[in-house]
Structures are given as structure tokens and as C-alpha cells.
From Swiss-Prot:
The gene is pyrG. GO terms for molecular function: ATP binding; CTP synthase activity; glutaminase activity; identical protein binding; metal ion binding. This is CTP synthase. NCBIfam families: PRK05380.1, PyrG. It catalyses: UTP + L-glutamine + ATP + H2O = CTP + L-glutamate + ADP + phosphate + 2 H(+); L-glutamine + H2O = L-glutamate + NH4(+); UTP + NH4(+) + ATP = CTP + ADP + phosphate + 2 H(+). It comes from Bartonella quintana (strain Toulouse) (Rochalimaea quintana). Keywords: ATP-binding, Glutamine amidotransferase, Ligase, Magnesium, Metal-binding, Nucleotide-binding, Pyrimidine biosynthesis. CTP binds at S13, D146, I147, E148, K186, T187, K188, P189, T190, Q191, K222. One of its GO terms (cellular component) is cytosol.
Amino acid sequence: MARYIFITGGVVSSLGKGIAAATLAALLQARGYRVRLRKLDPYLNVDPGTMSPYQHGEVFVTDDGAETDLDLGHYERFTGHSANSQDNITTGRIYRNIIERERRGDYLGATVQVIPHVTDEIKRFITTGNEEFDFILCEIGGTVGDIEAMPFLEAIRQLHNELPRQSVIYVHLTLMPYISSVGELKTKPTQHSVKELQSIGISPDILLVRADRPIPETERCKLSLFCNVRPSAVIQALNMPTIYDVPMAYHKEGLDSEVLCAFGIDPTPKPKMDRWEDITYRIHHLEGEVTIAVVGKYTGLKDAYKSLIEAIAHGGLANKVKVNIEWIEAELFEKEDPASYLQKVHGILVPGAFGARGAEGKIQAIQFARERKVPFLGICFGMQLACIEVARNIAKIENASSSEFCETKNPIVGLMTEWLKEDVLEKRAKCGNLGGTMRLGAFAAELKEGSHIAKIYGMTRILERHRHRYEVNVDYKDKLEQCGLIFSGMSPDGVLPEAIEYADHPWFIGVQYHPELKSRPFDPHPLFSSFIEATVEQSRLV
């Protein structure tokens, strides 16, 4: 029988509920339990696929093609288990499901209301498909007190009474701010947050309290008294140097032990923390450092590149180096010479994006990497622009561009109108909806025997996650290959380019997919490991 852990947040947003949920799942996993993580988002969008990166941050894509919250990336990286479309739901998706049922007449003429229909739909999502797991951890997005979150909180309140005894606990993540003028950590914000939670019928079993310094025992006892939790269930969650330090820190604070105690599990399995001890040791015993430039479009919000940042760090771990990232807004290179910004970096990475803004600046960065023999990795949009760069500067194709930017006689990159998914032809009209209409999820690619990328992978058939609406136009393949560009990866049907490289460049690779989505701290993606290895070599030349 599955047990349920609901993680809520209070006081302020962005406290790290996703990291807390992923950490707790990893700790339970270390004790031999089977865990599943789910995220419930209160916004009305059906999914984050059409949301601005500045509003939402990264859109994390699962193998089955779901566009989900970035916290699912943390879930995968901490547990090693792949998420799917049933691990993230939004208010928009819930309402869409309910309205579809109402139109079909499934409610038999009943007045459709938030209670019971919306709450029942939420409960159905939470409790479905959990037969193979010991613990289901559900993170409730937003902050307690937000009007959007009320149906979710009501649903998890109801589940406490509907499921067997000792099947549900609540973990509340909160903040204990330090007031420098008086030199004290303050408990009052947490007290009020818990009071708000209790007013809707939920009493937290465990308080996970964020703080930037150790919490005195007197303040813990105060929280215990006023928030109605055991003193041992007030767990301090101190700021850590990296997110991969968090599991060991929470374990030492007794979070996993307290959770098992709340469920009445005794005796508890002994945890095997070897791999977390190893990863924290390696993080703090690096032997050098390199610097790479990420030339992007959304550099003002690092959450837009969350998986990319982590994958770069994983590549650094694999090479025992710290990787410093120089964030460069691509539009800068449309006004200034990129050389002054890029001549001292050891690698250049152009990540995925949409739209024309910043594209010309990225092309300038790609040209610099190609001509100066600087290690280069282009992801999705980055690969497309690398093809436009060679078309313009070597093949001399007039007006070479992308149909995403403008009408052009030479669309090196064009809109995909059809592609194969699991042997089924999917089609898209140019004037169709944007949401959920891209090439999404895991697709196979065939790598050219003997190519650089095939050697990196150690195989010629790979399965990687995609999220794109445009694709390099295969009609220009021969002309670009005559200029030295190698199409080293193609879709199995030979229609869609998946990877490019140069034979005469020490490390220049572009891929249409998103390798960062499958990188793990314990299993770094081979492309990032190899890319950072190349930057280490480059650092010896600069």
C-alpha cells in the first residue's frame, strides 16, 4: 500500500520545495523504498509549454513528450527515475478534463462545482497508478494562502480522512528570516503560515525550516509549541553550497527518520548513503576550473536554463573541474565584437530558444567558435543557427535564414509539418495552435559510424528528448556537407537532421535534441562530459 507525503510551502515562494521533495525521495530511496514524485501546479495554463521562460523558467520535457515543471528535472536527477506525463498536472488541465466530461454528460446533469468535482479530479490524479510504489511525494505549487492553491489543499485535506490511518503526512517548508538589526531569527512568519494551513484543516506533521544560519534550540521549541508539532519534527534546512549537498544535510538533521516515525514505521531500514557521500566529496575536491560562455536569450533568469546548468556541472564533475559560466545576452553581439568577450573562454555553448531576437548575435558567437577552434556545443536552436552560419559564411548561400524569422528564398531551417512518432505520422498546420504541437519527447537518432559524436556515445543508435517546431532543411544537406559540415546524426527515416560536426575542428558539435534533460549527477551525459573535457584541453592553450 502506498503512503502519501504532501509538501507545501509558506511565507514566500521559491523556497525550494522541489529540491526538498527530491531530497526526501532520494533519502527514502536510499533506505530501499520505491518512490514516485508528482507536482501539482495551481496555474490555469494546461501546461507550461507556451509560457514565457521569464514567467515560468525551464520547460522540462519527459520521455513521453509532456511539457512539465522544471521541478521534475530535480526529481529525475536526484532519484534517477524518469518522470512521465502523469507526474505533473495543472489547474488548467484539471478544468479541461472536467469541462470535457461535463460536455459528454458524464455528470448526469449535476451542477459542476469546485467541491466535489474539482477536488475529486485532483484526488484521482494523486492516487492513480501508484500500485508499484511505497511512497508518493506530491509537491503543491505556490504558497499557502494563494487563492489558486485552495482546491489542491482541500483535496489533500480530504485524502487524510479517506485513506487508511497513517497513510498521509504533511511536510511544510517555511522560512525563518534573520533580522540583522536585532540579530535574531524570527519565528512569527512560520507561525502565521502554519496557522493559515491549520485554518483549512491541515496540520503539518513536519516543519522544514529554511534559514541562513543554525536555528537555536529555544527557537525550535518555540516553533514546536506554537505550530503543534513535535520538537524533533522541526527540521532546520540551512543554505548549502550546492543542491547536491542537501541530501546529506537533511539526512544528518533526521528528516527521513522523522518521516518514517510519522508513518509509524519501526524498525526502519538502514540507509545506504554511499553515493551521496561520494558526490558531495567530489564536488568539494575538484582539481581545476574552466570557463565557458553560454550565449543565450533568457540569461536574465537562470531558471530558464536549469537543466543545462546542472548538466554542465555534471560534466565538470566527470572531469574533476569546476565550470564557471559566463552568461552573455546574445543581442550584445549584434552591436559589439564577440572577440573581446569570447577570446578568454574555454568553450562556447548556444542553447535552445525560439524566435528571431538574439539569433544574429548567436550566429556571431558560432562563427567565432568555428574560426578560432574553440570547443562549441549547439543545442536545438544552437544547431540550427550553426547550419545557417556555414550556409552564409562558407557556402555563400544568399539570404540563408530560418522561416521562423522571415520569408526567405533559402530557408536553411524550416517548419516541420510532419514527423514520425512510434511509427505514427504526426502532422501540424502552419496556422495551428502552439500548445503541445511540437516534436516532443524521446525520439531515436542514427549516428554516423566513425563520427566524433558516435565515439562520444560509444554507439550509433541513441534515444534523446526533443522539443522543437523547426528543423534543419534536409534539402541543403549536400551543399553544406561540401563545405565541411558533417551531418553525423539523422532520424531513422533519414529525413530529420539530428547532429552535426566538423572533422577539422577539435570539438564542434550541434544536436537538435536536448541532452541536458537526461544528465544525472551520478551519470553525466556523455556529450557534456566530452565537451567539458575539450574545454579542459582548451584551457591549456589559452
